[in-house]
Amino acid sequence: MVKLAAKCILAGDPAVGKTALVQMFRSDGTHFQKNYTLTTGVDLVVKTVPVLDTNDSVELFIFDSAGKELFSEMLDKLWENPNVLCLVYDVTNEQSFISCTKWLEKVRSQTSGISLPGVLVGTKTDLAGRQTVDSAQAQVWALSQGLEFFETSVKEMDNYEAPFHCLAKQFYQLYREKVDIFHTLV
């Protein structure tokens, strides 16, 4: 049984639902807070995620940071050498989707040229009548950036775990590839 540890950056504009998503995931769906205050610094959420079809797991260290601090020195330090990325936008806020390009560039600038597995998550799908970001367009963009695509409603407890299970699986697959390469060298 292998237990890996991965640094996960949670990025996106303010008020897109990053904190709600990660808090729901941390509590296994038992905690949905109706009123959130904007994150002003960084919260660290740690949760062990089993890797499907194995006896192994990945402990995700999820850095939930304030969305308004796009170019702060604090983020530069905290975001050094991430292992996986969870990029979040609000399906009812087109600007939050457009901003994903800037967030992705910011996070990738911290990776020293290595491939960074990740997911793009559209939140607040329970507000479908107000949706301004086309799901197909978001999925095409995500795939063009090498990201898996998910939509979720934390309020409705819909699909909030899937992005994190995907991140754990992506990180685990990178680990397995490195182990396989190592075995070919020995």
Swiss-Prot record:
Is rRNA-binding among the key words of this record? Answer: no
Naming one, the record's GO cellular component terms include: nucleus
* Source organism (scientific name): Mus musculus (Mouse)
Positions with a binding annotation for GTP: 12-19, 64-68, 123-126
Q: According to its UniProt record, where is this protein mainly located?
A: other
GO-annotated biological processes: cilium assembly; cochlea development; inner ear receptor cell stereocilium organization; intracellular protein transport; intraciliary anterograde transport; intraciliary transport; kidney development; smoothened signaling pathway
SUPFAM superfamilies from the xrefs?
P-loop containing nucleoside triphosphate hydrolases
One of the Pfam families matching this protein, by short name: Ras
User: What's in the keyword line of the UniProt record?
Assistant: Cell projection, Cilium, Cytoplasm, Differentiation, Flagellum, GTP-binding, Nucleotide-binding, Protein transport, Spermatogenesis, Transport
Knockout-associated phenotype: Null mutants retain the ability to ciliate and survive through gestation. They die shortly after birth due to different phenotypes reminiscent of Shh signaling defects: polydactyly, lung isomerisms, and structural heart defects. Conditional knockout in male germ cells results in infertility, abnormal sperm morphology, significantly reduced sperm count and sperm mobility. Mutant mice with germline deletion of IFT27 die shortly after birth with structural defects in most organs including the kidneys, where duplicated collecting duct system and/or duplex kidney is often observed.
Tissue specificity as recorded in UniProt: Expressed predominantly in the testis (at protein level). Co-localizes with RABL2/RABL2A in the midpiece of elongated spermatids within the testis (at protein level).
Q: Which family does it belong to?
A: Belongs to the small GTPase superfamily. Rab family.
Return the PROSITE patterns for the record.
Answer: RAB (PS51419)
Q: Which residues form a coiled coil?
A: none
Q: What is this protein called?
A: Intraflagellar transport protein 27 homolog
| The protein's role, per its UniProt record | Small GTPase-like component of the intraflagellar transport (IFT) complex B that promotes the exit of the BBSome complex from cilia via its interaction with ARL6. Not involved in entry of the BBSome complex into cilium. Prevents aggregation of GTP-free ARL6. Required for hedgehog signaling. Forms a subcomplex within the IFT complex B with IFT25. Its role in intraflagellar transport is mainly seen in tissues rich in ciliated cells such as kidney and testis. Essential for male fertility, spermiogenesis and sperm flagella formation. Plays a role in the early development of the kidney.
Provide the protein's localization. Answer: Cell projection, Cilium; Cytoplasm; Cell projection, Cilium, Flagellum
| Entry superkingdom | Eukaryota
Q: Which GO terms describe its molecular function?
A: GTP binding; GTPase activity
Database matches in InterPro entries: P-loop_NTPase (IPR027417), Rab_GTPases_membrane_traffic (IPR050209), Small_GTP-bd (IPR005225), Small_GTPase (IPR001806)
